[in-house]
Regions:
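N-terminal phosphate/diphosphate-binding loop that engages ATP/GTP or pyrophosphate donors
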Residues: 33-81
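Phosphate-binding P-loop
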Residues: 2-12
C-alpha cells in the first residue's frame, strides 16, 4: 500500500471492493462518497426492497437520490437471477440518466458489478468505458461470477480490496487517502 495518494499518478486508478454478502461493501461505498464529495462523484448503489420483513428485490439509488427497481420476485421475463426477475430495460434507462463523464465529475461509483447488473449489455459496455476513462472508478464487485465479473478482476488497471469485518475502518481510511 505504498502507492501515491493521487489517482492521476496511479497506474491502477480503478478500485474494486469485494467481499462476502452482508459484509458492508455498500456501507463502505456510501461512507467514501460522503468523504469524497469534493470529487463530485456520479453513480449509484443498490439497496434491498423489503416487504413484510422479507427481501423481495433490489432497487437502484442514484447518488442524486433518484430510484429505480433493478429486480423483484414479481418481475417476469427472460432475465432472472435466482428468484428475481431483472428489469434490464428499466436499468438501462436509469443508467443513461447518470452523467458519468461530466466534466466536473472526478469519480465514478458503481455498486455493484454483479450477476443482475451484468444481464444488461449496456451496463457491461459502460463498465469497460469507465475502466478505460481517465477518471477513477470505485466499484463493488461480486466475489464469484464469470464473464465481466471475472474479467474486471484480471485487468492491470484495477486494485482489488477484499472487505472483511476486521478491515472495515482501515479500508475506509486507506481508500479515502488514495482517492482524495
Amino acid at each position: 500500500m505504498g502507492e501515491s495518494s493521487s489517482p492521476d499518478s496511479l497506474p491502477r486508478k480503478n478500485i474494486l471492493i469485494t467481499g462476502l454478502p452482508g459484509v458492508g461493501k455498500t456501507t463502505l461505498i456510501m461512507k467514501l462518497v460522503t468523504r469524497l464529495k469534493a470529487l463530485e462523484p456520479m453513480g449509484f448503489y443498490t439497496a434491498e426492497i423489503r416487504e413484510r420483513g422479507e427481501r423481495v428485490g433490489f432497487e437502484l439509488v442514484g447518488l442524486d437520490g433518484r430510484k429505480a427497481v433493478l429486480s423483484h420476485v414479481n418481475i417476469r421475463g427472460v432475465h432472472r437471477v435466482g428468484r428475481y426477475g431483472v428489469d434490464v430495460q428499466g436499468f438501462d434507462a436509469f443508467l443513461k440518466t447518470i452523467p458519468f463523464q461530466a466534466g466536473e465529475t472526478g469519480l465514478a461509483v458503481i455498486d455493484e458489478i454483479g450477476k443482475m447488473e451484468c444481464c444488461s449489455s449496456h451496463f457491461r459496455r459502460l463498465i469497460i468505458n469507465l475502466l478505460e476513462s481517465d477518471k477513477p472508478l470505485l466499484a463493488t464487485v461480486a466475489m464469484k461470477g464469470g464473464g465481466l465479473i471475472a474479467e474486471v478482476k484480471l485487468r492491470e488497471d484495477v486494485v482489488i480490496h477484499e472487505l472483511t469485518p476486521e478491515k472495515r475502518e482501515m479500508l475506509l481510511e486507506v481508500l479515502t487517502g488514495i482517492l482524495s
